[in-house]
């Protein structure tokens, strides 16, 4: 039982007027640790008990069983709880040492599936820093859901269909060079895409020609299909090389094209349920009763189906295939209206499981405050960015530790980890401005800072030649180690909060706090001094490293043992 739950349960025994959950939510952390570890404000009981809060606090403090705590005292309208540091530190250290990386593993999911729609780059377009957000947020959530006892199913819903393929075919037939495309597929296809879009702005026939080629593709024309398949295959080879660098894997690459033959069923179902209404020649579903002003446009007047029709087909397919407990879509915030419509249409169709679908939205990445755009060629490409991050990490490692073994692998872990961590520490609804120098810094709230704290602890443990014993009781009661113990004890709750809020920044901020607390402890404590507390201090180091490494793993970031 964590300390907050323990305190809430002890208060509940003497305050029948309040539920334990309500007490739990009222507990506060005093600004000054001299005032205790947690405090209960008695204001909420004043009306019920018809007494002054100060009097209530004083009376209740007398009634609470103190045997679980160092002391319980009333200070004004608050009951302040001082926890038994030695006892709690002993319990926490034992739990971490016994469980290792399984510490804080939970069983909420009971093995049920969570579908995660993530990454989803567009074929024949470069993998930019904008796609990184969906990729790393989705990957971190997959680790978090697994830690909560779910089985994540990571789906890369590739953008492999649409009018842009008509544009690309036109461009390739005009200016394409097969050898150049094979040598540098995405680079060459991007050049063609930017060039044809520029031409389309002054020549309206380009759009018509592109639409014609896309119609051919939809009709299964041999030349169009072969070109499309080739663009897709070459792009995927390049994407997979990047995913390997990021250490991100997928369970499915079913993209937009996969659902081409599954949309008629959606139209039939909507028809059968009398949900389709004609509007200006198009077929729509009215969603006003859900507070959604604009109807969902299912089929255009020319008979073409739309993005939402495809997503309806995908949602049905995923429910049937994975029978998910949750289905999350890690997609930019600009798609918020689309996902509201998607859920509402499924609800109208009678699918209550649409309540289990969540749009995990996120803000934009900018560069110098400006929005990025593939069409205008204003992008930060991920591959050269990753390469530069690794180089910057390598030069810092060279300066700090020139004799380090396996420098390349460590530089890769630090460079890639720096980019991921910087993205994930930002509240996902906020965007951030891309700054590689800040990302790869070993100082401040960065991935390398947390990794370095972990590596420092491993160095201490190697020097001491220390491995904790599961049968030894370790305990500490000093103020600096107590700050670390409280954080480690809070780790299971941090995992649950991260999962409940689909918010990896909660985990990233926890990792920063733990690294900072350890560095403060390291600065004020002679850890390796040979006295009666040495093994207790080393056990704390071991537990801290275990939790830091696991927190980083849940963010998809490696923790090297040496830097």
UniProtKB/Swiss-Prot annotation:
GO molecular function: arginine-tRNA ligase activity; ATP binding
Locations listed in the record: Cytoplasm
Oligomeric form and interacting partners: Monomer.
Protein name as catalogued: Arginine--tRNA ligase
Assigned protein family: Belongs to the class-I aminoacyl-tRNA synthetase family.
Lineage: Bacteria, Bacillati, Bacillota, Bacilli, Lactobacillales
Reaction(s) catalysed (UniProt annotation): tRNA(Arg) + L-arginine + ATP = L-arginyl-tRNA(Arg) + AMP + diphosphate
GO biological process: arginyl-tRNA aminoacylation
Main location: cytoplasm
Pfam families: Arg_tRNA_synt_N, DALR_1, tRNA-synt_1d
Gene Ontology cellular component list: cytoplasm
EC number(s) given by UniProt: 6.1.1.19
Keyword annotations: Aminoacyl-tRNA synthetase, ATP-binding, Cytoplasm, Ligase, Nucleotide-binding, Protein biosynthesis
SUPFAM superfamilies from the UniProt entry: Anticodon-binding domain of a subclass of class I aminoacyl-tRNA synthetases (SSF47323), Arginyl-tRNA synthetase (ArgRS), N-terminal 'additional' domain (SSF55190), Nucleotidylyl transferase (SSF52374)
EC class (word): ligase
Motif 'HIGH' region: positions: 121-131
């Amino acid at each position: 039982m964590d300390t907050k739950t323990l305190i809430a349960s002890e208060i509940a025994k003497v305050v029948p007027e309040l539920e334990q959950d309500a007490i739990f939510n009222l507990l506060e952390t005093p600004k000054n640790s001299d005032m205790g570890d947690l405090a209960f404000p008695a204001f909420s009981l004043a009306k019920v008990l018809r007494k002054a809060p100060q009097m209530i606090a004083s009376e209740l403090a007398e009634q609470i069983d103190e045997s679980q705590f160092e002391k319980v005292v009333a200070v004004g309208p608050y009951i302040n709880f001082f926890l038994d540091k030695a006892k709690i530190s002993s319990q926490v250290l034992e739990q971490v040492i016994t469980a290792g990386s399984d510490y804080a593993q939970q069983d909420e999911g009971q093995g049920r599936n969570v579908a995660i729609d993530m990454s989803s780059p567009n074929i024949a377009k470069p993998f930019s820093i904008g796609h990184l957000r969906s990729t790393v947020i989705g990957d971190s959530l997959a680790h978090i859901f697994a830690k909560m006892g779910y089985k994540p199913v990571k789906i890369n819903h590739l953008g492999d269909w649409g009018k842009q393929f008509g544009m690309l075919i036109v461009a390739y037939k005009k200016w394409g060079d097969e050898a150049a495309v094979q040598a540098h597929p995405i680079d060459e296809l991007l050049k063609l895409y930017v060039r044809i879009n520029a031409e389309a702005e002054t020549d309206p026939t380009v759009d018509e020609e592109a639409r014609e080629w896309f119609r051919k593709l939809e009709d299964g024309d041999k030349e169009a299909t072969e070109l499309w398949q080739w663009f897709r295959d070459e792009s995927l080879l390049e994407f997979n090389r990047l995913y390997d660098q990021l250490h991100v894997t997928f369970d499915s690459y079913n993209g937009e094209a996969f659902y081409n033959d599954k949309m008629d069923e959606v139209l039939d179902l909507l028809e059968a349920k009398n949900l389709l209404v004609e509007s200006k020649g198009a077929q729509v579903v009215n969603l006003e009763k859900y507070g959604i002003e604009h109807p969902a446009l299912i089929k255009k007047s020319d008979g073409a189906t739309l993005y939402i029709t495809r997503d309806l087909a995908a949602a049905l397919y995923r429910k049937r295939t994975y029978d998910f407990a949750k289905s999350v879509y890690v997609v930019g915030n600009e798609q918020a209206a689309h996902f509201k419509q998607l859920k509402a249409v499924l609800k109208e169709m009678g699918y209550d499981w649409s309540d289990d679908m969540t749009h995990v939205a996120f803000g934009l990445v900018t560069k110098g405050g400006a929005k990025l755009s593939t069409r205008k060629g204003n992008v930060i490409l991920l591959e050269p960015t990753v390469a530069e991050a690794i180089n910057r990490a390598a030069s810092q490692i060279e300066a700090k530790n020139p004799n380090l073994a396996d420098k390349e692998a460590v530089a890769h872990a630090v460079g890639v980890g720096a980019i991921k961590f910087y993205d994930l520490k930002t509240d996902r609804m906020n965007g951030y401005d891309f700054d590689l120098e800040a990302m790869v810094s070993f100082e401040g709230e960065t991935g390398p800072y947390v990794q370095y704290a972990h590596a420092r602890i491993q160095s201490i443990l190697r020097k001491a030649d220390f491995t904790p014993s599961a049968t030894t009781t370790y305990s500490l009661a000093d103020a600096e180690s107590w700050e670390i113990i409280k954080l480690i004890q809070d780790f299971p709750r941090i995992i649950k909060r991260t999962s409940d809020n689909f918010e990896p920044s909660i985990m990233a901020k926890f990792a920063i706090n733990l690294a900072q607390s350890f560095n403060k402890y390291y600065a004020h404590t002679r850890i390796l001094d040979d006295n009666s507390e040495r093994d207790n201090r080393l056990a704390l180091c071991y537990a801290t490293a275990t939790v830091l490494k696991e927190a980083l793993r849940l963010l998809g970031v490696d923790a090297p043992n040496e830097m």
